[in-house]
Amino acid sequence: MAQTHSFNGRKRVRKFFGKIPEVAEMPNLIEVQKASYDQFLMVEEPSGGRPDEGLQAVFKSVFPIQDFSGASMLEFVRYEFDPPKFDVDECRQRDLTYSAPLKVTLRLIVFDIDEDTGAKSIKDIKEQDVYMGDMPLMTDNGTFIVNGTERVIVSQMHRSPGVFFDHDKGKTHSSGKLLFAARVIPYRGSWLDIEFDSKDIVYARIDRRRKLPATTLLMALGMDGEEILSTFYKTVTYTRDGDNWRIPYSAERFKGMKIISDLVDADTGEVVLEAGKKLTARAAKQLAEKGLKAIKATEDDLFGSYLAEDVVNYATGEIYLEAGDEIDEKVLKTLIDTGETEINVLDIDHVNIGAYIRNTLAVDKNESRQEALFDIYRVMRPGEPPTMDSAEAMFHSLFFDSERYDLSAVGRVKMNMRLDLDAEDTVRVLRKEDILAVVKMLVELRDGRGEIDDIDNLGNRRVRSVGELMENQYRVGLLRMERAIKERMSSIEIDTVMPQDLINAKPAAAAVREFFGSSQLSQFMDQTNPLSEITHKRRLSALGPGGLTRERAGFEVRDVHPTHYGRICPIETPEGPNIGLINSLATFARVNKYGFIESPYRKVVDGKVTNDVVYLSAMEEAKHSVAQANVELDEQGGFVDEFVICRHAGEVMMAPRENVDLMDVSPKQLVSVAAALIPFLENDDANRALMGSNMQRQAVPLVRAEAPFVGTGMEPIVARDSGAAIAARRGGIVDQVDATRIVIRATEELDPSKSGVDIYRLQKFQRSNQSTCINQRPLVRVGDRIHKGDIIADGPSTDLGDLALGRNVLVAFMPWNGYNYEDSILLSEKIVSDDVFTSIHIEEFEVAARDTKLGPEEITRDIPNVSEEALKNLDEAGIVYIGAEVHPGDILVGKITPKGESPMTPEEKLLRAIFGEKASDVRDTSMRMPPGTYGTVVEVRVFNRHGVEKDERAMAIEREEIERLAKDRDDEQAILDRNVYGRLADMIDGKVAAAGPKGFKKGTTITRELMTEYPRSQWWQFAVEDEKLQGELEALRSQYDDSKKLLEARFMDKVEKVQRGDEMPPGVMKMVKVFVAVKRKIQPGDKMAGRHGNKGVVSRILPVEDMPFLEDGTHADIVLNPLGVPSRMNVGQILETHLGWACAGMGKKIGELLDVYRKTANIEPLRQTLEHIYPDNDRNEPVRSYDDDAILMLANQVKRGVSIATPVFDGAVEADINAMLTDAGLATSGQSTLYDGRTGEPFDRQVTMGYIYMLKLHHLVDDKIHARSIGPYSLVTQQPLGGKAQFGGQRFGEMEVWALEAYGAAYTLQEMLTVKSDDVAGRTKVYEAIVRGDDTFEAGIPESFNVLVKEMRSLGLNVELDDTREAEQPALPDAAE
């Protein structure tokens, strides 16, 4: 077993602490997006045999379209996609949408209609391909490129179609009575509500409109009163027996009743039960067994019953009494008078069976189907007079027309399950049986039988992913189109047109564009780091069109539900108004074809846990008992304990092991990806875990990524599935590597029709949506052998194929002079100087030269009134050089705009004529660096409109691009040649030649020496005598020629795209994009966090020598406040600190053994230590089978710290941490004596010290700090704008005014409210005074006062400001007068 597992140093090796084996493979993390959209487009399916779903279903549902007269019909045949015009990178660069043209084949059939018989015969059939706009395609990473930016379509959670029963929880009526209601929700169409009111009458509502008695709806379905009653109630027959009546006795009916008068056997006359006693269920059953058939009833017992059928005089046809009438003395007399001896009564006892439907029928004014239909028509279309036809058509179209009403397959399945029906799932409209079943079930609920539905159960909520959302949107577009097509078919001469002339595809294309551009669910991708991308694609939102709104969503919808287990993460959700409405899919969850979330379970057969995995939705899981993943099992897979903790029907309980039939697959199946990345999650408080999982998404990719010492084993999965790290598509040998690409010669999965070369282009310093930097680095060397799935390049925030969002830093938990008060963080200067938390951010600046009314704008270096110094970074075309260092206010692109001619004085005209002065008619509108930004120009792109002459800069960029493409082509060609000629040489070596190149003797044996005498291109001239081989040679040749042609064609196509002008928005002649990169070191004011919700702001950066240090002189990197732990209850960070300390200790030990090896060449101690760290089990690397080179590689990898994995809920326990600390030769307390860096004295107590994984978050002080002297003002109030984006000022608000008032600082207050704010004249004067060096000013009237006066005038109050102050007061009258 010497070298079965090759270790090439290209992956991070982790020591696993998990004890539970991984049985099921975790599904691909972005499967949700990709599978859904693939199912919608079905690009791979042959166009003839596509199943009826996705796009195919949309076309099938709208077509065929008939014109109004039925003389012609437009049918859908199939659809196809042409290859996309631009690839993903080109679309990103040119601000285009990555999409493929959709071609639909339509068939127009024209009929001849016989005027006499009305019979149709086909006159003409025309088929044609019609272009139906572009359909956006999904990239390999599950995103869409729309107008050059990457977007994600978030999946939506909504209420599943079907029927739901609920009550108002007693809130509607003051008595607190429960009012039950049923609601039938279709996928599309009208909602049907059936509800009780406080008087127990059953009402129906259609589309939340005015309510109607439910019996009206039943009558409209064609039932009459008697039929309705017989459907809902059983009947009891009272038989006349002398003066008394007999009632048949049934135990069911009488059990539980309190007997008012004696129960008398009608046959024997004996009293079987005295009055006042209660008839228990047991006693009732015993009476029946004794042979009690009927009991005596008096006339009083009949009163209050209801007739089950009409009482009719058959001779005259007169109806004496109607079904449902209540029996009183008068009715009874009528019955006796008519000579009835048997009366059929409805079986209503007001206890088990209520008279709700009978009472509703009594309230209902409608007597017939026509009246009922008219009533429904009046509610749905108020103000229109109903006719029988229109009412019938309208009622039919509400629930029974598949065009207007669709329950969807899900809705039908759910309805069948809830109501015990057995309709096919192709029946997608309502039936009479369905409506009756709903009303019956509702009445049962009111009678106290059955359960209401829980709408927050995941069995009643489903996920609409990209494909389905897109399908609905496209259907809307096609339906808009359908109207236009119908009108056009009727209005033009149908014989002469082709399908193309009938179709205007704009509405369909517009619907798609609108969805991707402005839907609430189409979001700008969060691309801060690979984790945030993956989380964004796995997000589930309850908001959006057809979903909830933040204001209306109550507590229950947001709460965690038992069915979330293994489906939706209970931890990861935003803080704030969206809490619980936006969720994340759990790690192992997947969405089934009906849109329900499924979670995997292991089957338990005969008490033994098998490795059989089944995926179940919440509905299917309800009937099982599910054990947890960490239940103790014996060797055979049986449960060790007699009683096992398990989940059953939403409750957690102890169940005997025989009853358990399923078991969780993995402990991490209940949390999301982000939460599964937090080690010791089980020791953190849920609120802090929520913050931790949310903050990991905000971590900025650092210049040097470093994987955590303490991980969870999820890191490589996230890095691979997010597409940040590049995995090999197939095995092979590395042929070439440089920073921008990797070329691999394939040796596995060789397909003769495809190239034998895989070229992987790496992204270099690209800007992400959040301005972070995307940069990939190769991990392989030339000559390496690669297997499929190996990581060959690291991306942003990945390290050897592991997700690496932050850095491992040495932390001490202790207060330090108040600098870590209130979660502040004290950092060592070493962290800044070593660029530990340095990140690169790339800003994009764009400038466009437009064609204005006064003439075109121009991008140029010749700008009026600008010094040569300011132009030093611009080339002759006026565009900044790559590599230039730019600062706030520097010109990036020089641009001038023509300005309107102002009338010139004669002197100006003369000067203009003499000096030819041109500068006066243009103004400088150059693109300058905004305040507070600086950096280095890393890339410039120039786009020109078709037909506009290119400047020198654009030509240079173009040449560079073409050179790069040519290099790619040449490399691919070289590898192709090597491959093909190698195979050719193998095939003909040692064969007898039948012919050959010029001067070659026939019949000679071909050898490799002989071949070298001829140039390779002449080898094809060798012909061999073996005909079969000759055929193979010819096949190889034609394949080689095809590959060469394909390569050349691809190259020419790309060159043509580069040289061709760009598509620009209207009015734009030329566009320049400048990318500026800035290196941001960490500084006070930046936000940092650990993975446990322990966040803080950097308060001070201390010189290294002042930081606390250990006995061996190692200084702490970071000092955190220990008071941040106890109240927050995120103890995980302390366990991580200890374990990180042990990892670093082990690393140090291995480093020492490496030094020993270098001196003595004895590798054994090193091998033994590594084998001890990685014991042989199925989770750890098989270090025992490593050869010496691999051992040295591994030792070099782990000498800074051994990486370990502690999976969530199955991680390292205290004993493991102690053992590892002991192995590393450290104290098991995890504490050390620290010395004060300023005095050199030891601190009084030992301090917890260790390694924590810290992240730098995307809340950087550079983006927030902002100052303004003068800037823009609001138009109306003339006050400065607010906010950094508007270059606004500080608002001196109401409360601040109170503060100055309280101080009595009148003059300060006056200038705050006037010249420093919105006194326009005053502030100009102050400016002039300051320029003069004068310090006096006079306050005028603030503009906001004028606004107030205007507002009052708009209300009709004429307010005038009287500012005519009397110059002098009138003199006081003399005393004498």
Curated annotation (Swiss-Prot):
| EC number annotated for this UniProt entry | 2.7.7.6
| Family annotation (Pfam families) | RNA_pol_Rpb2_1 (PF04563), RNA_pol_Rpb2_2 (PF04561), RNA_pol_Rpb2_3 (PF04565), RNA_pol_Rpb2_45 (PF10385), RNA_pol_Rpb2_6 (PF00562), RNA_pol_Rpb2_7 (PF04560)
A single GO cellular-component term from the record reads:
DNA-directed RNA polymerase complex
Q: Does the keyword Transferase apply?
A: yes
CDD domains for the chain? RNA_pol_B_RPB2 (cd00653)
Is the keyword NAD assigned to this protein? Answer: no
Give the protein's function: DNA-dependent RNA polymerase catalyzes the transcription of DNA into RNA using the four ribonucleoside triphosphates as substrates.
As for family, the record states: Belongs to the RNA polymerase beta chain family.
PANTHER family of this UniProt entry? Answer: DNA-DIRECTED RNA POLYMERASE I SUBUNIT 2
Q: What is this protein called?
A: DNA-directed RNA polymerase subunit beta
Q: Which organism is it from?
A: Brucella abortus (strain 2308)
